[in-house]
A protein has these predicted regions:
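A cross-family phosphate/adenosyl-ligand binding-site feature
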Residues: 1-55, 60, 65-70, 120
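YjeF_N-associated NAD(P)HX repair module
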Residues: 51-145
């Protein structure tokens, strides 16, 4: 009974692979999808949402190899100012999984749902991860750290 919206930071026409398939599935099953291309889109969306209860951060993942660039850096700043719970999927966006240091900017989550196991850098990164919960995704035990 809770309304859900999925925000895409960028142009849906540029999506490829699983991201494109999942974006299309969301549309087919009736999930509200919004495209955020900049500050004006973000501010327009916020004005329409008087009470945001929860944000699920799944912007960037473990493949991030350099500093967070604009416009994602700006969006992370906006997320960090929202007065609601922020749950990061696997890793807060912008956080280095190995060191726990932000790569220019990082989401400050209240909770992180780590897939299979906590990342090596989580030990000193509670400011960004919040409470860490491990989700079993059937990762073979032999491959776990």
């Amino acid at each position: 009974g809770v309304p859900v919206e999925v925000l895409l930071l960028g142009d849906p026409a540029r999506l490829r692979g699983a991201a494109k398939i999942n974006w299309e599935i969301l549309g087919r099953i009736g999930v509200t999808r919004r495209t955020i291309r900049g500050k004006s889109d973000w501010e327009r969306w916020l004005r329409k949402k008087p009470r945001i209860r929860l944000v699920l951060d799944a912007i960037l993942g473990t493949g991030l190899s350099g500093p967070v660039r604009e416009p994602i850096r700006q969006v992370i700043g906006w997320l960090n100012r929202l007065p609601c719970e922020v749950v990061a999927m696997d890793l807060p966006s912008g956080l280095c999984a190995d060191t726990g240091r932000p790569l220019g900017a990082a989401v400050r989550a209240t909770r992180t749902v780590a897939c299979a196991f906590p990342k090596a850098g989580f030990a000193g990164a509670r400011r960004y991860t919040g409470r860490v919960v491990v989700a079993d995704i059937s990762f073979p035990r032999v491959l776990r750290p």
